[in-house]
Amino acid sequence: MAAIVIVGAQWGDEGKGKATDILGGLVDYVVKPNGGNNAGHTVVVGGEKYELKLLPAGVLSETATPILGNGVVINLEALFEEIDGLEARGADASRLRISANAHLVAPYHQVMDRVQERFLGKRAIGTTGRGIGPTYADKVSRVGIRVQDIFDESILRQKVESALDYKNQVLVKMYNRKAIVAEEIVQYFLSYADRLRPMVIDATLVLNEALDQGKHVLMEGGQATMLDVDHGTYPFVTSSNPTAGGASVGSGIGPTKITSSLGIIKAYTTRVGAGPFPTELFDKWGEYLQTVGGEVGVNTGRKRRCGWYDSVIARYASRVNGFTDYFLTKLDVLTGIGEIPICVAYDVDGVRHDEMPLTQSEFHHATPIFETMPAWDEDITDCKTFEDLPQKAQDYVRRLEELSGARFSYIGVGPGRDQTIVLHDVLADN
């Protein structure tokens, strides 16, 4: 039995999809415990590139059962568009299952998201505008609509009307928008009920029974540690808990059953949207990482902000998630750049901080303290073992490992599934 949770250790886009794709073919279930169609990931299988948003990367596994857990918020239109797109390319999404307790994104959530961001102006968070935050807000406020609700029309209508009693007041009187018609929302949800019904399960029961039978479960977290609503760079965060603890809550798998916590981390750092970013680059090297690393958001099309590796954040992520292992990605992007700076600590108003500053204000004023290491010039994309890497690349990896709080068990040297060096097999260890 193994229950492995995959967590982004930075601000997202670390390569969680690749890690899930590799491990997903070796497990029985792949569950997405949080997020929605606001965070995309790219998976390369057999030379084919798949860009997924709502579905877990495990949907491309030929053997694993992919599950959207209770912590996910689901846009049904986006869900079936993604399924249809995969099947049009020959992929089989028929094994997908969905928790009856997952919440649904309503059209009015997307409207609220966009008008709120517009109202905030320069203070906007930089959301994707897909209604994720408002859906989670309704969940916490106990006025959300769950998957199970669309199979009972009377309950569905009651919940939609109740939600719109308040939201229409806000839209009309505060934002000068038209009121949303409740019946249109009800019919929108009902139109998906028949297609959705065969997919819906008691995910908590299924997953725990699988573990009791000695099967393997992979929890594929969305977003990343530094976007966690509690542990991230608040308020520039997502609306869920994309950390190891959140994976337990969003899947219904108890924390004592989690056997490994695998952090996914780039050999440099990126971020999309607003918020502090101590190692951010504004020179030619930022543009270099952006171009060579292909740093454009799958979901938004926005260019990612790029910076050097930040070991302060890595140590913080290790602590918050209890990482047992790291999966280092995009090492190949650093080939041939001369010298590689590594952030080992921060300077905040003349005081050295080896760990995350206590307050958000201090973090905003943090200046990175760097040490540098020489880069390598050799092409590493065909390396199969750690010993195949140039010595300078080995030294860089080992230094990051020393600084980051957990052992490095996987190293990505290219986008392909087979372009991965395995130092420790987390499944074999469990």
Curated annotation (Swiss-Prot):
Pathway: Purine metabolism; AMP biosynthesis via de novo pathway; AMP from IMP: step 1/2. Disulfide bonds: none annotated. Substrate binds at V298, N299, T300, G301, R302, K303, R304. GTP binds at residues 12-18, 40-42, 304, 330-332, 412-414. GO terms for molecular function: adenylosuccinate synthase activity; GTP binding; magnesium ion binding. InterPro entries: Adenylosuccin_syn_GTP-bd, Adenylosuccin_syn_Lys_AS, Adenylosuccinate_synth_dom1, Adenylosuccinate_synth_dom2, Adenylosuccinate_synth_dom3, Adenylosuccinate_synthetase, P-loop_NTPase. HAMAP family: Adenylosucc_synth (MF_00011). This is Adenylosuccinate synthetase. It comes from Corynebacterium glutamicum (strain ATCC 13032 / DSM 20300 / JCM 1318 / BCRC 11384 / CCUG 27702 / LMG 3730 / NBRC 12168 / NCIMB 10025 / NRRL B-2784 / 534).
